[in-house]
Amino acid sequence: GGLDYCIGSVHLVNKTRGGDLWFIDGSKQQSYDEGLSRVFDGNIKEAVRAFFRQTNEMIASQRPSIVGHFDKVAMHNKERYFGTDEEWYLALVRETLELIKECGCVCEINTRGLYKGRYSDFYPATRIIRIMNTMEIPAVVSTDAHQPDDLDKFEGVYTLLREVGYKRLVYFDGTWNEMKVF
């Protein structure tokens, strides 16, 4: 056997190997805030850099088929600690996108934050999807479903993909295939 494909993503961030962990996911913004304070002494830039460093290490060492929600660190931020349009943040995003392309990974476009009401955009965010398109990074659409009722939550994603210029997506059906954005 073996796996058909692997999705790689980071949910827990540490400051030092073996150290305390910052949980960036989950339903509670309070956990994000408390972890930021406890693990990184409230230094959001250091924390976000650690998130992207770990994401890049995962991509380079594991070479997953799909990189999942690599801007998830912004979910509970809600533009409170940093702006996702700030240059230092976008530089980290671009570095990760370059690595995704170099390693031949597919980038997931994930709708979960929207349909769960936890985020105001897709993962990655629209501005990042635009960059992905210009870099010609292959993309797959996912709901990141945790239960059957979440399987068809694709509202708005195909319209956005057409608007930003994506022409083709990839999907797995025993082998990797391409499809036109409809």
Please describe what each predicted stretch is:
Residues 1-102:
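Extended substrate/RNA-proximal surfaces in nucleic-acid metabolism proteins
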Residues 21, 80-182:
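Charged catalytic cores and adjacent phosphate/nucleic-acid-binding surfaces used
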